[in-house]
Amino acid sequence: MSDGKLERRKKLMAITLEKIGKIVEVLPVFFHTKETINVIGEPGMGKTEILSGEMENLITLEVERVWGGEAEMKKKGFDVKNHYSFIDGSGMPTEAIVIPYINNEAVDHLQRDLIPELKKARRFLADKKNDGLTYVIFIDEFTSFNQSDQRTLMNLIQSGLLPDGTRIDKKRIWFILAGNPAPSIPGFEDSDSPTHEMELAVITRGATFFVAPDVDSFLLWGATASKQWTGEKLVGRSNIHPYLLSALTKNKELYNKKDITDVRVLNSRTAKKLSNYLYGVEDLKAQKKGDHCWQSIVIEAYAGVNIGQSLASTIQHLDSLVSPTELFGDGKTNKISKADPIVKKFEAMDGFEKYYLLLKATEDGSGVDFSNENYVYKLCWIMGNLTVPSEVFGALGDRVLNAPEGTNVKNLFDNKYFQAAPDSGYNFLIELAQLRNLTKSIE
């Protein structure tokens, strides 16, 4: 693009960079309306992991509601990956491998690699078992497609017409697009991402968000509770394992840190995969499928040797702390005081240690059941009488306010004592949740 055209475009476009965490808040509405969203931002900032994680959460909640609970989900063999297609535009062949098909007004061409995913969507929508359910097509690296393919995909979204002439029900299909910015976009002039210009059709046929790199949004999203299917049951847990959240809250510089001695890096993608591994270990132990424990070799496999060793050391340290059940007791009484040796240990902990322990306590299966009012009282007392970092208030505030139905943290939110207790700092939780981006980092 010439300098003159770029200057004219700058005058026409006023780009506001949003934090990815802010966009996550509005995703349920787009999931409901099936309006396309397009998220543009630099690579490595967590777009794909955050969007896909939230997408899986929305799908799981919808299936639980439509099918009537986890018993039916298990009976019907629920697998969230059967409910969406993930298409990586960067993996599309560079040569013109295309298939012509008839659209309303013209003959379009579509990459051959896309056809199986579109057929998968059609089969899903035709299956009576899936009546009332949404199918999602997530196209990552959308700007890796040339402009001709971008137009073709937009025509598909607009018309719902598949290459074989059949149509898909647009009211039951939701498109998510994510891509890297072209240098012609104001605010991204220095971008060196390999990308094509974004078609105007993409911008006008959906809500286009431009996002800025923001590790704090990634950590905040990671601390939010969602419902996840283990293959056996639904559990409420963090989007990112509390081990990693606490370690990264303590050492944010480890996130996306380049190591000249190792090609591996701890970014949003590897953090999510490492989190899945850590939860997988917990699931196997809970299902009594062996005496499993996390291994530092796996952490290094995702994050690299140097950063992996630092993470493993922090996780090992967190493992040595008092457990949530030691801090909260057996739930038979609400007695708790500063004279209690366990409470003294908690009070002496660093901020990131308290962060881990309280987040872990609100997960399903932690041994601290917040449908029991004695546990609720103790949490309220801890938040009101002990030294708790502001990050914990912010993370718990978001966690409580956005808790899915049927989870441990939702039990906490619904508890009348928690909402009324003067010690709970309930209003403070809400206030900090709304102002979460202003909280200080844990020293």
Where are these regions (language model features)?
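Cationic, low-complexity basic patches in intrinsically disordered or flexible, solvent-exposed regions
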Residues: L6
